[in-house]
Amino acid sequence: MEDLYNTGVRVIIDNYLIEESKKVRDYGNYWSASSAGYCMRKNIFDRLKVEPTNPDDARKQRVFTAGHLFHEWLQSLTKDAGCSVSQEGELQDEKLMVIGHYDDIIKVDDHLILYDYKTANSRSFGYKKEMSYFHRMQLGTYLYMLRQSKEYKNLTESRILTLEKDTLRTKEFVLFYDEELEAEILEYWNTINSFWTDKKLPPCTCEEQEGGFMSKPAYNPYFYNGQPCSRDWYELWKENNKEKVNGK
C-alpha cells in the first residue's frame, strides 16, 4: 500500500514551510519588542544571527502559521465590529533601540485598550492562571513606546487575549501601566544595550524564567553540550564565521 504520510500535499506544504523558516527576520540594529523579558544572552545570539542548534521542523512551522491565521481572524473581527481603532502599528524607539508592531488598539466605553493576541493548545490554556512574565514585558514595552506619542500618551490599559485552538475558548489577562512597570521595562532594555555596547555576553537566565522551559533542548535554539544558550556553541560559531563576525 502506498505510504500516504510521505506522499501527497503534506510533503509539499512541509517543504515550503521549512524553506520559509530559513528566512531570518532582520531587525537591523534594533531589538524586537516581542523578545522583551527573554534571556538577554538568547536575544544577543538572535541579533548576531548565531546559527541555531535545533532548526524548527515542519510541525512547529505548521503550528506557527496556524497561529498567524487565528491572529488575523481576531483582527478582522474587531475591525468589522467597529471597535478597532488601529492595528499592526509600527513602533520604534531610538533610545532603547527597540522596534515592533502591536496587534490591536480597541475602543471600549470611551477608553482605549491595547490588545495582544496569543493562541494556545488546550493543555497550556487550562493551566494559565496569570499573565506570563514574557507577555507582561512585551505589553509593557508596547505601552511604553505608544505613550511616547501625543495620541496615546494617556493609554494605560493593555490585555492579552489567548485563544484556545481546539474549541476557540478565550481567556484574558490585564496589565496596567504604572511607574513600577516603566522602571522594569527601562532597566531591561538599558541593561541589554549595555551588554551589546560593551561586547559582553550576559549570563543565560533561561532556567530562571517561567519554570525554566526555555532552557530545555526543545525550546532553546542554542542548546549545546547540555547547556542552554551555550557559550561553547557561540565560540564554535564565531570560529566558523570569522568573516561574518568581523564584519559586524
Where are these regions (language model features)?
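Metal-dependent nuclease catalytic regions and adjoining charged, substrate-binding loops involved
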Residues: 4, 145-248
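Mg2+/Mn2+-dependent nuclease catalytic core
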Residues: 83, 89-196
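Generic signature of intrinsically disordered, low-complexity segments enriched in small/polar residues
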Residues: 8, 19, 30-34, 41, ...
